[in-house]
Amino acid sequence: SLGFDFSKGRLDTSIHPFSGGTPDDVRITTRYDEDDWTGSLMGVIHETGHALYEQGLPIQWRGQPVGAARGMVLHESQSLLMEMQACRSSEFYSFLAPLIATEFSVEGNQWTPEALSRNSRRIVPNFIRVDADELTYPLHVILRYKLERALLGGDLVVSDLPYAWNDAFESSFGIRPPDDLRGCLQDIHWYDGA
């Protein structure tokens, strides 16, 4: 229903959600948490934004600049548009609520479109960027940007990054990462320049 063409792609499971491929073969992966299905849903929606961008590239221009993705900035804009805007809208939850009721055999006030929409917009600080809410997600990006500037400017050495990360995270989010896995090492995208 989001427009992903499964005849030109597929969805699989992995440790961390990602997508990639060519316009005629785009692969999406996600992870599942049986205690919180919403994280999986939003991960799939985010990766679907990437996949739709790839599937929309002109196949006839493959191998030429005009047929290539314009970079990670545009890629992320498309995925975040799907995740943070289109699929957190009341219209989306009006579509989704009956599907949830049918697939999970649930009913009650917490499963109405309005309740699902409110739940998706809760502001709760999270150590993990890809699980962040729509307000704190940009703070994750700003934190990385500031630390990158300090590293590149010579004001921070790599060995001090975990401490600098934890201090800056606590200052911005009000919570302190308990370990590097939920701190400076939690995001594979940061190290590959995305």
Per-range role (PLM):
Residues 1-37:
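Contiguous, non-catalytic segments that form substrate-binding/exosite surfaces or channel walls
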Residues 16-22, 65-75:
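Beta-rich nucleic-acid/ligand-interaction surfaces
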Residues 88-192:
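Long, amphipathic alpha-helical stalk/connector segments used for oligomerization, subunit docking
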Residues 15-27, 51-58, 113-122, 177-184:
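Active-site-adjacent bridging/hinge elements
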